[in-house]
């Protein structure tokens, strides 16, 4: 039996009532808002919960508006179906100012460390700041930057410090090659309508590696992660 497809970051919850065969061949990490209801009974479906940088804007006028949210996330994290914290991080184009984003990012880093859950990171035009924060806090839990599109030189710097990169429908081919060779690569659909099969096929074409080989490698990584 071949390894399942791992969709490391998606915003779409598979429909268990319709796609029953899907769950035999796919594993998904679905990103949920901190207020969403979690269904722990969908096979091979895990979740990440956190405060997205885009959601931080309310803290501009009410600095403590997320205190209760952080506590609510903390209460949910012991659920076995919640695999990761996030997506959290920095966005230079949307959300509150960088100081507020940093404060909330740090709060979620602490949750990740305390609850022993990997951290999924949203990062737009703030890779240097993300790397500097990583070096300053020395996390023990894996960090995964999702939707990575930047250049290979930046990718190498991030991976040298232990950060994973997840690639979706748009990516830098040289960066994907670097991540594959470094065993730091994940694949995702994010919010797109493309299937994870299409993403794997695109990665296969880029890497000149069979889809089944990619599936086996990422599944091995996944079993180590959980």
What are these regions (language model features)?
Residues 1-226:
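Mid-domain alpha/beta scaffold segments of enzyme catalytic cores
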């Amino acid at each position: 039996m071949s390894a399942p497809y791992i969709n490391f970051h998606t915003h779409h919850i598979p429909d268990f009532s319709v796609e029953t065969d899907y769950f035999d061949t796919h594993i998904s990490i679905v990103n949920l808002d901190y207020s969403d209801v979690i269904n722990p009974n969908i096979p091979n479906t895990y979740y990440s919960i956190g405060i997205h940088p885009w959601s931080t804007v309310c803290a501009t006028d009410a600095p403590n508006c997320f205190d209760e949210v952080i506590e609510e996330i903390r209460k949910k994290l012991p659920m076995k179906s919640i695999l990761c914290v996030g997506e959290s991080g920095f966005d230079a184009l949307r959300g509150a100012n960088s100081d507020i984003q940093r404060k909330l990012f740090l709060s979620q880093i602490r949750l990740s460390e305390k609850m022993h859950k990997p951290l999924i990171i949203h990062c737009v035009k703030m890779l240097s700041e993300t790397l500097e924060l990583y070096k300053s806090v020395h996390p023990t839990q894996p960090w995964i930057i999702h939707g990575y599109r930047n250049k290979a030189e930046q990718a190498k710097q991030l991976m040298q410090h232990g950060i994973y990169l997840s690639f979706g429908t748009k990516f830098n081919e040289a960066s994907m090659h670097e991540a594959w060779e470094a065993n730091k690569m994940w694949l995702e659909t994010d919010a797109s309508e493309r299937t994870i099969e299409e993403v794997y096929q695109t990665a296969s074409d880029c890497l000149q590696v069979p889809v089944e080989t990619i599936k086996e490698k990422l599944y091995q990584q996944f079993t180590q992660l959980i």
